[in-house]
Amino acid sequence: MIRRIYELSSFFRSVIEDAVIDRNLTVTPFLSYPRGCCDMGSELLAQYLFENNIETEMINGTSKMDNSHHVWLCTKDEITIDITADQFNGQEGMPSNIEPIIVGNEAPIHKIFSYERIIEKPICLMHPIYQDVDWTNVRECKLCEAYHILLDKYL
């Protein structure tokens, strides 16, 4: 299962990177991917994994150092999935050489964001395949737009 999740996550990250390079994914905040993209990137990955029969929850963790946040996914079997952790490479107080794709046990970067953790259901589990998007919610609209760009051109 870990190998399959890693392959799907790796492919999905490469799709996001290609879409950014091609200037097809210009929805904020993706132009600086992976920086600042953990929330929306995790939501999009959750949708893709959901479509591949893998359900996840989103973990929104806070760092005690500076109250910053980071978001990643976790399966019911406690498999950690993170395609944006490397945004912290080179930042003071953070581990060095953070892998671009983390699938498996929590990595040292996740332990930094363990001060307060909120577990949330990704939108895909509330609105399967974004059929019932709340079009008055800007965040949901951006997620839907981004996912459809990826779906139409890369997936």
Predicted regions and their residues:
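A structural boundary/capping signal
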Residues: 1-155
